Each structure stands twice: as structure tokens, then as C-alpha cells.
């Protein structure tokens, strides 16, 4: 059986996505997609690359995702699915790239500096 693989990362989340020809079943860490991202409206964004190339019901997705929070995991899955689709059909790159699905979002949390409360929040300063 043929399968296509893509890795997606976002913040601290890492998603490994395996696409196999099927009927649209999506499994995340052994659970159904809707069960894993229960009640999160944003979760449907993870499947946008499949919608963009009209492949929503043509593949089963087996996904393992670790680290980060749910939002980062959703974006990691989105990138992983897009990369797996390009592996399946390199012509999809032309559709997915302009929509931003193949771009790794490199923004990460800025580190806390000493002498400050947070990354940028400085202690209150009194002029007089």
C-alpha cells in the first residue's frame, strides 16, 4: 500500500503525517480528529490543504503529534499534510505555495531576559 509522509512543525509542536488513499478518515494520536480537537473551531484549519486541492475525501490521514499546545499542533498538522500532498503529486506545489501552506511559521516565544519581568516587560520606572 502506498503512503505519503510529511513533517510539520510549529512552535514546540511536531506532527508526523501519513497520507494513504482512502475515504477521508483522519486519526490523530490514535483518536478521531474531532475527538482529539474537541470543540476547537480552529481545528478545521488543519485540513485546509486537502480542501485546496480537492482531496478531502480521497485520503486517510494517520497523524502523530507531540509537544506544544493545541493551536501549535493544528498548524504543525497543516504543514505536514501540505508536504505529504506535494510528495504525492509535485504539481500540487503550485496550488499550495501561494496559499502559504508550505511555509514554516518560524515565530517562537522570545526568551525572558534577566533584569526584566518577562521578555520585554521592564520593572516600573519612577523618574522622580
UniProtKB/Swiss-Prot annotation:
Entry keyword set: Ribonucleoprotein, Ribosomal protein, RNA-binding, rRNA-binding, tRNA-binding
Biological process terms in GO annotation: translation
Protein name listed in UniProt: Small ribosomal subunit protein uS9
Gene: rpsI
Gene3D superfamilies: 3.30.230.10
A Pfam family annotated for this UniProt entry: Ribosomal_S9
PROSITE patterns noted in UniProt: RIBOSOMAL_S9
Subunit structure, as described in the record: Part of the 30S ribosomal subunit. Contacts proteins S7 and S10.
Molecular function GO terms recorded: rRNA binding; structural constituent of ribosome; tRNA binding
Xref: PANTHER family: RIBOSOMAL PROTEIN S9 (PTHR21569), SMALL RIBOSOMAL SUBUNIT PROTEIN US9M (PTHR21569:SF1)
Reported function: Part of the top of the head of the 30S subunit. The C-terminal region penetrates the head emerging in the P-site where it contacts tRNA.
Family recorded in the similarity comment: Belongs to the universal ribosomal protein uS9 family.
Amino acid at each position: 500500500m502506498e503512503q505519503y509522509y510529511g513533517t510539520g512543525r510549529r512552535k514546540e509542536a511536531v506532527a508526523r503525517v501519513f497520507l494513504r488513499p482512502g475515504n477521508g478518515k483522519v486519526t490523530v494520536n490514535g483518536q478521531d480528529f474531532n475527538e482529539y480537537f474537541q470543540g476547537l473551531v480552529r481545528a478545521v484549519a488543519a485540513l485546509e490543504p486537502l480542501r485546496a486541492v480537492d482531496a478531502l475525501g480521497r485520503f486517510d490521514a494517520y497523524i502523530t503529534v507531540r509537544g506544544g499546545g493545541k493551536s501549535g499542533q493544528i498548524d504543525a498538522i497543516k504543514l505536514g499534510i501540505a508536504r505529504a500532498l506535494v510528495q504525492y503529486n509535485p504539481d500540487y506545489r503550485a496550488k499550495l505555495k501561494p496559499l502559504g501552506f508550505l511555509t514554516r511559521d518560524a515565530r517562537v516565544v522570545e526568551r525572558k531576559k534577566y533584569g526584566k519581568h518577562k521578555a520585554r516587560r521592564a520593572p516600573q520606572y519612577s523618574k522622580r
